[in-house]
Every structure is written in C-alpha cells, then in structure tokens.
Amino acid sequence: GNITLAPTAVVMPIYHEPVQRALGGMRAVFQELAQQKQAEAVDFYVLSDSRDPEIWLEEQATCDRMRAELGAHQRLFYRRRRINQNYKSGNIADFLRRWGQRYRYMIVLDADSLLSARCIIHLIELMENRPQAGIIQTAPRLARAETRFARLQQFANRCYGRLYGAGLAAIQ
C-alpha cells in the first residue's frame, strides 16, 4: 500500500546461530518490504552476542555482503557486544539504550523466525492503531517439521493453534 509507516526497528538478537539461515530470513523480509515500497521506514539490526571469532566474523561478513547486495547501507546494521551481560534481554536493552530513541516501534525476531513483509506492516499498523499496547505477541507456528513427533506437533498446532491463541488473547 501507499501508507506511511512509523519508524520501526526490526532487531534479531543472535548467539552462535546458523548465520546463513538466520540472515537469509532477514534478507527475504528486507527484499519483500522494498518490493512493497515500505523499506524506508524499517531498519534492521543484527545484535550479536556470539563469542566464537569464526562465527562472529561470518556474521559480520554476511551482513556486509547483504548491505552491499541490497543497497541497504543505512537500513541494515550489525552490532556485536564485547560483553554479553544478561544474555538476550541484555542485548535488547543495550540496543534500546543506544538506538531506541530513533524508533517508535521495535519488532524482535528470533534467529529462526520467518515473518512476511505483510505481517511486519500489519504489526506496525496494529501498534499505530493501539497506542495503549505495550507488547503485541504473535502466536508461534511450527514449520518444516522433520521428525514424526515434530510433524504431529505441527499438525496439532494447525488444528488448535488459532483457538488457543484466541483464548489466550481473551484472558489477557
């Protein structure tokens, strides 16, 4: 659409995650937002707490390559903390102290999260339309299950997930 989105940070705290998978999902979201002419409102941050130099050097190189390939020099940022105090919550708190004032909203992705651009736009619109909301939590959904047990969980999630999510939302 032609709506103007509020400034939003999409942050992905990572710690020794499979780099190509984690950043591949972020790349896909960035490209989809750009296709919908909505990329200007959204900045992406990879917030690394990785300790292994081999891993964080791959993270940094992958982010640099993505920035160049996507023309995202002012939209995609990589930051690695030298001291990973308080784990993931400390990583996000550090981001908020340093850069949080630049944005009206923040969307936190896990390294294995897959969100469409449409979903991100919808989340921003929800936050914009509900200023009293402090947190909007999506209902997680399993995807690409491989083991028999995981496929059973995925099936149950498809059958009951929406009902469970609606019930949980109603009591909050």
Language model: regions and residue ranges:
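Long helical/loop segments within the catalytic core of UDP-sugar-dependent glycosyltransferases
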Residues: D64-R104, A117-Q172
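The conserved acidic donor/metal-binding loop of glycosyltransferases
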Residues: D110-L114
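Phosphate/oxyanion-binding active-site loops and adjacent basic polyanion-contact surfaces
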Residues: E17-G25, E54-E59, I83-N91, L115
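Acidic donor-binding segment of Leloir-type glycosyltransferases
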Residues: A28-N84, R141
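Short aromatic-hydrophobic micro-motifs that form the base-stacking/packing surface
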Residues: Y105-L109
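Structural beta->alpha junctions
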Residues: I14-P18, R51-P53, W99
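N-terminal membrane-anchoring/stem segments of glycan-assembly enzymes
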Residues: G1-N2
